From Swiss-Prot:
It catalyses: cytidine(1402) in 16S rRNA + S-adenosyl-L-methionine = N(4)-methylcytidine(1402) in 16S rRNA + S-adenosyl-L-homocysteine + H(+). GO terms for cellular component: cytoplasm. Keywords: Cytoplasm, Methyltransferase, rRNA processing, S-adenosyl-L-methionine, Transferase. NCBIfam families: 16S rRNA (cytosine(1402)-N(4))-methyltransferase RsmH (TIGR00006). This is Ribosomal RNA small subunit methyltransferase H. S-adenosyl-L-methionine binds at residues 39-41, 59, 87, 102, 109. The keyword Heme does not apply. It comes from Porphyromonas gingivalis (strain ATCC 33277 / DSM 20709 / CIP 103683 / JCM 12257 / NCTC 11834 / 2561). PANTHER family: 12S RRNA N4-METHYLCYTIDINE METHYLTRANSFERASE, S-ADENOSYL-METHYLTRANSFERASE MRAW. InterPro entries: RsmH, SAM-dep_MeTrfase_MraW_recog, SAM-dependent_MTases_sf. It comes from the Bacteria. It is found in: Cytoplasm.
Length: 311
């Protein structure tokens, strides 16, 4: 895989010690870091492996390959983690001992202005693709979706109460542009009158989150990865997942509690009881960053860490 030459800077790994403890690393074991990024977690895992140990690192972003570990115990997989099961089968792994997922968007993505993940600069194109070779970008969604579809997107993925008004304003604004909405600045202008100055950063973050989730099918990929993890882990293997917003955390919480990303409805629970989970939850409540880490690494502020062991 060809890697661009420019230097790549990623985030400091969040809750590194807690993740390593959660994985309960066997030096001779096989592990997967499905969100390789800058390689911070992976480097720490490899340091605990013997010459017999193995680590696979997944990342769909071409930039991540610049950080690949030059270690014979490590294999980089340039793919979306939704294909975890496919690649474990390809590499002949009949069971792994631990899987780590840090679901946060790296600071690298926000700092690379041309990727369009951040609203801090108005000039970039609205891209937001984690894999730049993948399908449609955020601009295509904003220009092609009707008001109803945009409203649903903002409501479900951004949890925005004014989703309908935002969608209507975007549709109205894009019709005034000969080339449609293309840049971050144009999107900001389209929604400016609907956002309270006091909550501007929070509401813009929710808008951009909703678009990013849609562009990359993040929740669909997460569901596939979780289901694959259950099949790939050996009995006694550990799943360690770090989430950064309520949509992800709810899916992970349900999956560990019920074995499915959607909780059973009340009627099913009343009639049949809760389904038996294939997981023993090591953390009944999610772990959060220490006061010191919050001070040293602001990115850890919204992180929630859940750990479970396959029964």
């Amino acid at each position: 895989m060809h890697c661009p030459d420019k230097e790549s800077v990623y985030h400091i790994p969040v809750m590194l010690g807690e993740c390593l403890e959660g994985l309960r690393i066997d030096p001779d074991g096989c592990y997967v870091d499905v969100t390789f990024g800058g390689g911070g977690h992976s480097r720490a895992i490899v340091e605990k492996l013997s010459s017999k140990g193995r680590l696979y690192g997944f990342d769909q972003d071409a930039d991540a390959c610049r950080n690949v570990l030059q270690d014979e115990r490590f294999t980089f997989v340039p793919s979306n983690f939704r294909y975890l099961a496919n690649f474990m089968d390809y590499y002949g792994e009949d069971g792994v001992d631990g899987i780590l997922a840090d679901l946060g968007v790296s600071s690298h993505h926000f700092d690379e202005e041309e990727r369009g993940f951040s609203f801090r600069s108005e000039s970039p194109l609205l891209d937001m693709r984690m894999n730049a070779r993948a399908g449609r970008n955020a601009a295509a969604i904003l220009n092609e979706y009707d008001a109803s579809s945009l409203s649903a997107l903002f409501y479900h993925y951004g949890e925005l109460k004014q989703a309908r008004r935002l969608a209507a304003s975007i549709v109205h604004y894009r019709e005034s542009l000969s080339g449609g909405l293309q840049t971050v600045g144009q999107l900001l202008e389209a929604v400016r009158g609907l956002i309270s100055p006091r909550e501007e950063k929070k509401q813009l973050a929710c808008i951009f989150q909703a678009l990013r989730i849609e562009v990359n099918d993040e929740l669909g990929a997460l569901q596939q990865m979780l289901e694959a993890a259950l099949g790939c882990l050996r009995s006694g293997g550990r799943l360690v997942v770090m989430t950064y917003h309520s949509l992800e955390d709810r899916m992970v919480k349900n999956f560990l509690r019920y074995g499915t990303v959607k909780a059973p409805d009340e009627d099913s629970l009343r009639l049949y009881g809760a389904p038996q989970s294939p997981w023993q939850q090591i953390t009944r409540k999610p772990l959060t960053a220490s006061t010191k880490e919050l001070s040293d690494n602001p990115r850890s502020r919204s992180a929630k860490l859940r750990i479970a062991e396959k029964i």
